[in-house]
From Swiss-Prot:
Transmembrane segments: none annotated. The gene is rpmH. It comes from Corynebacterium jeikeium (strain K411). This is Large ribosomal subunit protein bL34. InterPro entries: Ribosomal_bL34 (IPR000271), Ribosomal_bL34_CS (IPR020939). GO terms for cellular component: ribonucleoprotein complex; ribosome. GO terms for molecular function: structural constituent of ribosome. Belongs to the bacterial ribosomal protein bL34 family. Keywords: Ribonucleoprotein, Ribosomal protein. The keyword Hydrolase does not apply.
Amino acid sequence: MAKGKRTFQPNNRRRARVHGFRTRMRTRAGRAIVSARRNKGRKSLTA
């Protein structure tokens, strides 16, 4: 029985573009995410 390939193929540029700070700040919901993580005291706000 053949298994598929691994689904996580790390790529720093894509990671930043999809989950990065500038991307988060573009939308209201994204700003809410960053704000919630600030309030919670997260060491890292975004990827």
